[in-house]
Amino acid sequence: MKGKGEQVFRLESSYEPEGDQPQAIEALRQGVMDGQTNQVLLGVTGSGKTFTMANVIAEVNKPVLLISHNKTLAAQLYGELKQFFPHNAVEYFISYYDFYQPEAYIPTMDKYIAKDLKINDEIERLRLKATSSLLSGRKDVIVVSSVSCIYGLGAPEDWKAQIIELRVNMEKERDSFLQELISLHFVRDDSDLAPGKFRVRGDVIDLVPMHEESALRVEFFGDEIERLQLFDHTTGEIFEDEEYAFIYPARQFVAGREKLQQAMLGIEDELAHRLNVFRSGEKFVEARRIEERTRYDLEMIKELGYCSGIENYSRHLSGRKAGERPYCLLDYFPEDYLVIVDESHVTFPQIRGMYAGDRSRKTILVEYGFRLPSALDNRPLRFEEFETMVPQLISVSATPGDYELRRSGGSVVEQLVRPTGLLDPEIVVRPVNGQIDDLLEEIRKHTGKGFKSLVMTLTKRMSEDLHDYLRKAGLRTRYLHSEIKSLERMQILRELRTGEIDILVGVNLLREGLDLPEVSLVAILDADKEGFLRDSKSLMQIAGRAARNVEGMVVFYADRITASMRYVIDETERRRSVQRKFNEDHGVIPASIVKSVDQVLDTTGVADAEDRFRRRRFGLEQRSRRGIEDLVGSLKREDLYAMAEELRLEMQEAAESMEFEKAAYLRDEVTKLEDAAEEKRESEGGMDSG
């Protein structure tokens, strides 16, 4: 067993581990210290899994990569861990695109869709800060990431080789320093100092590193650095003098001049071979296309050291062989680090599926002369490659998948007791015959107490019909399924959270953030129809939606008990027994979680002021019947920004599903909304100044 050694992480919290958190923390810590490569934390909904993870991180004394399956959850985890570890390097690494339309070609329509994107400067800064912290040699680094961590990056040794070290009294020529900044892709701008830019005023050079919020002033005296100062590039306020400073590249893909020359030769050779292939096959259009595009890129690389889409040449830049795995964020970690995969039952399948989708899209681009074959090596990791790069793994889920359980070899740590003392909701089975009347009666019992209900149906048509039936019965209800657009979907979820409706009917309610303490009833119609959304893991997940209420209850409507139902019923009863015994032994009285509307909105990631939400509703409801142009006049600036954000999410889903035309259409709508919002901002600013 390894000793604990000096603590590198400082966990700050007003809470102490409760329930069975202490045992879970110790078991996971011991497993990491003993060198176990795979562990599973099976933590029920509401048991405080994030706090347990934070305590384990505080004990293991090694860098940590925490992977979440979507940006929203990653942002929540990042915020929580920043609070837990204010003195350590908690970093954030997700896709830096506000919107991203990948390059694609549709042969059946002879339609090429150019790559279109908008980079979020703040997220790009946070990504660079993450890689900078990892390469700095610090051990107290926690990186919270989406699956972006498995996508290609520049080689860490190339990136590290480009770092500029500055020290007071160091000999360095001013002009050579300027050339170094340009080689790191900093841009000179003497009028607008911003991240990734520098300005020159005689012997004083000011710059804003991409990974820092403060600017750096470098004062020269002859060929010597006389002074280094940190300052606010907006106000000019001087913060402090520094003895030394490190300047990191302003882009993820960088290479020295020698490597660039080698890469260009490799690209030339590949182009020549590809032209022979096309011409011998009498594909002259494709040959002309690939030659024009590649020659243009080569000219840009020669002149600027960079080109749009340079990542597609990453194999040449890093000197890799065809088919060799790309460098990614995991390469920036030291050999000894810990990976925690949150919601592993969802995250692992997502990681597994990234490679195939990327490959199919790029193969078409290569076949039709839009890209060289080496572009195929700018890709996410294959799942088996990901596995080989993870030295130690903790998978976290309320319903771990077969993969995690098999890899752990039975090393499963359970966290079944909630700090609130709440038991898992009781599950009852009732017959299908008369299920609607029984459901109506049950819903009325729960709504009479001020609680909410979730109802899962088998089909979209059933959800709509049941919604109509409940509404005619005088209940406040809405339905939700895949045909409802993102804007309306968000509106419906807000109505549930703000108490404007009491019942939500849907086919798949697992994808929504519906962990609301007011939900006391979960009803699953036709629970015995084994298959998607009626398997054991889905049933367990949806049953957990009622786990935050002391009167939580789950009803399976079925004529027989399937193997999946039996597993969920037996497992729930086992957990209830453990929870009940703990409460009795420790004198804990179960209590529902109580949250205000504002708290609920905030914790579920839809924190809009209620009045803004009400003002925006008209626009949300009318979007399907009116064009964007008609809406902009009736909406306020902040509402236009909010609508653009919702459409951006819908656009990203379309792009990931390879619905490129839909994504392009939504991109145009986003642009219209943002342009309209900017016009309103400028006009409002003009009115204020007048």
Curated annotation (Swiss-Prot):
Pfam families according to UniProt: Helicase_C, ResIII, UVR, UvrB, UvrB_inter
The cross-references to SUPFAM superfamilies, in alphabetical order and at most eight, read: C-terminal UvrC-binding domain of UvrB, P-loop containing nucleoside triphosphate hydrolases
The name this protein goes by in its record: UvrABC system protein B
Q: What does this protein do?
A: The UvrABC repair system catalyzes the recognition and processing of DNA lesions. A damage recognition complex composed of 2 UvrA and 2 UvrB subunits scans DNA for abnormalities. Upon binding of the UvrA(2)B(2) complex to a putative damaged site, the DNA wraps around one UvrB monomer. DNA wrap is dependent on ATP binding by UvrB and probably causes local melting of the DNA helix, facilitating insertion of UvrB beta-hairpin between the DNA strands. Then UvrB probes one DNA strand for the presence of a lesion.
Q: What are the GO MF terms of this UniProt record?
A: ATP binding; ATP hydrolysis activity; DNA binding; excinuclease ABC activity; helicase activity
Q: How does it assemble?
A: Forms a heterotetramer with UvrA during the search for lesions. Interacts with UvrC in an incision complex.
PROSITE patterns in alphabetical order: HELICASE_ATP_BIND_1, HELICASE_CTER, UVR
| Record domain Helicase ATP-binding: where | 30-188
| Domain Helicase C-terminal: from-to ranges | 435-601
- Describe the family membership recorded for this protein in Swiss-Prot or TrEMBL: Belongs to the UvrB family.
This protein's gene is called uvrB
